[in-house]
Amino acid sequence: MNKSYFHDNSNIVAEGLRRLRKEKGMSQEELAAQLQLMGVDIDQRLISKIERNERFVKDYELACLCRVLDVTERELLADFYERFGD
């Protein structure tokens, strides 16, 4: 029986978020602070949980993450698209 990718990896944002945040030279604290300035109630602890695939990302959080990181949703989800194609 094939193991489902989504069963263990329900948050497809995790890998891309960690990668892009580090590429931008941002700490989890800095990212959380920028999100809070946009009115998103996320602290460093929640950023860490998202990056460890322990917390889902809400749709408005996804949009705000993209804005803060200055990337498109497609760029943030690039790891998912590379795994499964377009």
Residue positions per predicted region:
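Residue-level detection of the helix-turn-helix DNA-binding "recognition helix"
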Residues: 22, 36-37, 52, 81
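Short alpha-helical DNA-recognition segment
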Residues: 25-49
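A short, Lys/Arg-rich alpha-helix, primarily the initiator
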Residues: 1-23
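Helix-turn-helix DNA-binding elements, focusing on the entry/boundary residues of the two helices
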Residues: 17, 28, 44, 59-62
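Flexible coil/turn residues that form the inter-helical turn or adjacent wing/linker of helix-turn-helix
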Residues: 13, 24, 40, 55-58
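DNA major-groove recognition helix of helix-turn-helix/homeodomain DNA-binding modules
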Residues: 54, 58-75
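Short, charged recognition helix plus adjacent turn
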Residues: 2-7, 67, 74-86
